[in-house]
């Protein structure tokens, strides 16, 4: 099969690289940053933690499909999935809050 280059090591790029590798391609992933994960990062300041990218799996079926099609064990054997309700809560300076 073809030799394939994937630019970036975010979630989508890594999923594409995994699928290409399983299909028989020789895949090389290039990432300009110090770590893989793309926007999935965490910033801490003054005792507070801030997720700078996606922190929830809103569509776990997509990840299950990726694990199955790349020959991995089932998703639930690799990570613990916990339903979160509400998924997010935003509190504004005036005290109002929105839960989603």
Mark where each language-model region is.
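N-terminal glycine-rich phosphate/pyrophosphate-binding loop and immediately adjacent elements
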Residues: 2-100
């Amino acid at each position: 099969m073809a030799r394939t280059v994937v630019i970036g090591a975010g979630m989508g790029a890594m999923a594409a690289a995994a699928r290409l590798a399983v299909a028989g391609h020789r895949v090389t992933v290039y990432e300009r940053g110090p770590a893989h994960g793309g926007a999935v990062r965490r910033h801490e300041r003054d005792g507070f933690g801030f997720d700078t990218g996606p922190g929830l799996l809103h569509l776990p079926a997509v990840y299950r499909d990726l694990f199955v099609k790349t020959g991995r064990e089932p998703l639930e054997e690799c990570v613990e999935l916990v339903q979160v309700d509400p998924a997010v809560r935003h509190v504004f300076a005036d005290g109002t809050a929105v839960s989603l």
